Amino acid sequence: MRDNVERWIIHEGLQSEEVKNPENNFQILVKHAGRYGIPVDVFEPKGQPGILVIGAKVVMKNSQIARYLGFSAEEKERFEKKVNDFCNSIQVINKIITEDGKQKVGVYVVMDDKENINQQTMLDAIDDVSEKYDKTSRFLLKTF
């Protein structure tokens, strides 16, 4: 899987770098991907060989992070439910994470139809994640 993904990325002329992550068999960061030219991770989770996950992380603004960190447990739960409901409505898996001291909302598309993972479907998924990243970013600006 890794060799195919690397070859497809090179064939498309996309800039990328390998990311070390013990949770994944491999992880590649595509630096400027999709319509919006955002950084996108392409990886195969260790517990799910043959599954390809495409994801991007929306970094919350400093004012949003400060507000989020000031939330009570109940308010955080309500906020996370709002984000989750929105992401479900645009058919993307999400995860709120803290990374490099910043709150981020990861948006992910899972490619689990092993027979149909190829260069075109991966590129389509990258474009899809790029678009859903933009929608999630705008959602956060409007509602938070």
Predicted segment positions?
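Charge-rich, low-complexity N-terminal segments
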Residues: 1-51
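Short, internal acidic amphipathic alpha-helical interface segments
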Residues: 56-104
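Short, aliphatic-rich beta-strand segments
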Residues: 105-110
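C-terminal charged interaction modules
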Residues: 112-144
